[in-house]
Amino acid sequence: MTKNLFHYLTLCVLALSLVACGSDDDGSNPTPTVTNANRNIVTANVPKEITRLEFPHLRGGDNIVIVHKTDNNTKINYSVEWDYGKKSPRWSCFPMTNGSSKGGVGRNGPFEEDPDLPSSMRFSDTNSMFTGSGYDRGHMCASYDRQYSKEANHQTFYYTNMQPQRNAFNAGSNYDGLWVQMENFVQNRAKSLKDGDTIYVCKGGTIDSESMILERIKGQLIVPKYFFMALLEKNANGYKALAFWTEHLNHTVPNAHLADYAITIDALEEKTGIDFFCNLPDDTEDKVEKSLSLISWAL
């Protein structure tokens, strides 16, 4: 009796195993596949941080990526793609949280050469290029984007984070320049974030087409004709994106209506040739980059 019961139980287990195997193979509950065809790939020649969400797709060629960190090289500050053929930054990218602009450390200059950029890849004296040019040293990652730490703030004064800007466009005579108003928007937005939420920012000026270059200081240092900001906000509800695009103006815009300069990330990519937020899954990237809700950004 015991032997027959053993054989019966064995047959039941075998039958259940066959049914289970059949269920696994029938495709009724497949594992979802996340595609990310245009993501940055880490190689021996680039830093591992290029897979972070604030990074655009790297251009390659005569370009290097410099990542600046603080707190004994443990905390991301900002990153730059530097075109050493043009001796110009293409963009600076960085995260903003509700603590980024808090702390009140002020401006911790002076402006100086980036210690992480080989001297062969830059002008021998970038300061002299700006001096007497009539252009401001325009921050991409702003000094007031980094008020939580003197070390982080000081790094924003590296010339790799600067592009020439007209004063009326940059700060203006009474902080009424368009650029500083866009910066204020990002800073105020970040301050309102909940803990754990982040705005991923990429900012720069156009350097890749002669039609988008205003002039060259001393025939060398590129002055962009247009400037941009690409913003990706991540919170408990998911992602949303916004871009600003503007001509390099020669006048102030008091109380600017920033919605007039807002476009989709897709539109910004068309204008710049830069693939922003490439490390998002493709379906998420496609959705957020073609969408623009001014109301959700309080514009």
Q: Predicted regions span which residues?
A:
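Domain-level detector for secreted/extracellular nuclease and nuclease-toxin modules, and
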Residues: 22-299
